[in-house]
Amino acid sequence: MKQLYGVIGNPIGHSLSPVMHNNAFEHLNMDAHYHAFLVEEEVLGEAVRGLKALGISGFNVTTPHKVAIMEYLDEIDPLARKIGAVNTVVHKNGRLIGYNTDGIGFVRALQSISHEPLQGKRILLLGAGGASRAIYFSLADVGVKEIDVANRTVDKAKELIAARTADVNSVALSLEKATEEQGNYDIIIQTTTIGMHPHVEHTPLQICSLKKGTIVSDIIYNPFETKILCEAKEQGAIIQNGIDMFVYQGALAFEMWTGSVPNIGRMKQLVIEKLGG
């Protein structure tokens, strides 16, 4: 019997997940299909119960349901609970189990371009929203000890840091202070929507004094190179856009659902082609 997978969200028509997962199923000769489901906020509970009744094997969760879905699940992974959001659900033995692969996917993406272990690196996160929270706790989970958080409102950065449970040294900074301190970091991670199309001229941080070998990563992938990445490249930094994070979090969900490891390079190439790159 064909296995059913999918993604729920609103809007959902722009989702790149179906083409990525369906191609992986085809490549691995798996009898499965991945479908995008438009789900309004007011019917989320009914939608989740309906998917469970249909026998869906697993599904992704995107905006605006990542937090609200938690009350409709049978079990939530400890890391997802710490992050406070779920983006992947596994249907196992009649139970819906929620996970968060955003942060771990980002960590794997970062590891793919870093020539050294992340554990000894000093990292600066720009932003203190949901994506930053997922990345912060996932970095802490793999043993990173120095993670500072810069945000327009410093109190929000302080709230994120205060929620930590691991042994992590963290300081909350204003964006102005982060601009001054940027040369002290090995890795800078941009987690906000600043610089996303159509506001491509905006940047949360002017790159002006990076040290040699700095990695600058932006979770945005439209445009492929945001202003912060362009400035970082001019400074000689190693840069990474959000395509890698998207692909690695999707590949991790695929692995959790099926037990099979998809071809990351193939997934990435498909996404780039769909984005017109």
Curated annotation (Swiss-Prot):
Reactions performed catalytically: shikimate + NADP(+) = 3-dehydroshikimate + NADPH + H(+)
Molecular function in Gene Ontology: NADP binding; shikimate 3-dehydrogenase (NADP+) activity
Pathway: Metabolic intermediate biosynthesis; chorismate biosynthesis; chorismate from D-erythrose 4-phosphate and phosphoenolpyruvate: step 4/7
EC number(s) per entry: 1.1.1.25
Presence of the UniProt keyword Chaperone in the record: no
Gene Ontology CC: one annotated term: cytosol
Keywords, comma-separated and alphabetical: Amino-acid biosynthesis, Aromatic amino acid biosynthesis, NADP, Oxidoreductase
Cystine bridges: none
One biological process term in Gene Ontology: shikimate metabolic process
Residues reported in the UniProt entry to bind shikimate: 15-17, 62, 87, 102, 221
UniProt: NADP(+) binding residues: 127-131, 151-156, 219, 242
Active site annotation, chain numbering: 66 (proton acceptor)
Entries under InterPro entries matching the protein: Aminoacid_DH-like_N_sf, NAD(P)-bd_dom_sf, SDH_C, Shikimate_DH, Shikimate_DH-bd_N, Shikimate_DH_fam, Shikm_DH/Glu-tRNA_Rdtase
Keyword NADP attached: yes
Description of how the protein assembles with itself and partners: Homodimer.
Family statement: Belongs to the shikimate dehydrogenase family.
Physiological role: Involved in the biosynthesis of the chorismate, which leads to the biosynthesis of aromatic amino acids. Catalyzes the reversible NADPH linked reduction of 3-dehydroshikimate (DHSA) to yield shikimate (SA).
Designated name of the protein: Shikimate dehydrogenase (NADP(+))
Organism this protein belongs to: Bacillus cereus (strain G9842)
